[in-house]
Amino acid sequence: TPNKQPAHELPHLPRALNFYADYSGCGHWRMIWPELLLNCFGKANVQGGTVMIGDKNFYKGIETIRIQRQATEQQLNYIKWLKNVQAEKDFNFRIVYEIDDLIFREDIPDYNKFKFAFEDPKIRQTSMEIMQLCDEVSVTNEYMRNYYIEKTGNKNITVIPNFIPRFWMDRFFDLDKIKENFQRFKRKPRIVYCGSGAHFDIENRIKQKDDFFHVNEVIRKTVDKFQW
């Protein structure tokens, strides 16, 4: 009998796992949206979640395990266990540590409302050790790449910028609307800051000397010229 060929030959897709640290901005920009788009466009088979699975058979066929901002002792033990699994002959995955912010206490500004999460010296120690254990670290820009090379000694650090998903922003582009807005507001252009409240001294810890301190006077002087 002739060899039976499958009706549809599926292409080989790289398999990967994402372990999230959060489901908010960082989680979406760096993990969830890229995972969604890679799956939707058939570029890879990526699964994501927060449960660290202890059955090593689950990791067979996986090419990359990407962990986001892991820093606790339990998470360190999990990475050590993964490194032991990685060394076995049936496994060929790489472990990538994803970080898009500073997590070492000495470099986090005092006005940052979320600094308390990294005050414990154990957090610094465990996050440092995890980054040193990982095969690669991914960051958002060249500054952070150089920063973490200096801090951790891990030189295999890759810059992956943040990209806005087209399904979110692309449909809002309207050239006629842009021209209309320009004509309407050109006498007093609008300047908008879009970002986290962590850049502001919300709790007045250091008398408002935050990321906007150096431009406050400019804003005061130009409040009639620009709509801030």
What spans do the regions from the language model cover?
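Nucleotide donor/acceptor-binding cores
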Residues: 13-15, 93, 187-191
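Acceptor-binding helix/loop patch of EC 2.4 sugar-transfer enzymes
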Residues: 97-124, 167, 172, 176, ...
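Active-site proximal beta-strand in glycosyltransferases
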Residues: 64-65, 85-108
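Short, flexible/disordered intra-domain loops and linkers
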Residues: 77-79, 107-118, 198-213
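Donor nucleotide-sugar binding/catalytic pocket of nucleotide-sugar-dependent glycosyltransferases
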Residues: 132-149, 153-175, 190, 194
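Membrane-proximal helix-turn-helix segments that form the acceptor-binding/catalytic region
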Residues: 84, 116-137
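N-terminal pre-catalytic "stem/leader" segment of glycosyltransferase-like enzymes
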Residues: 1-75, 217
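Conserved catalytic-core segment of nucleotide-activated headgroup transferases in glycan assembly
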Residues: 22-37, 162-228
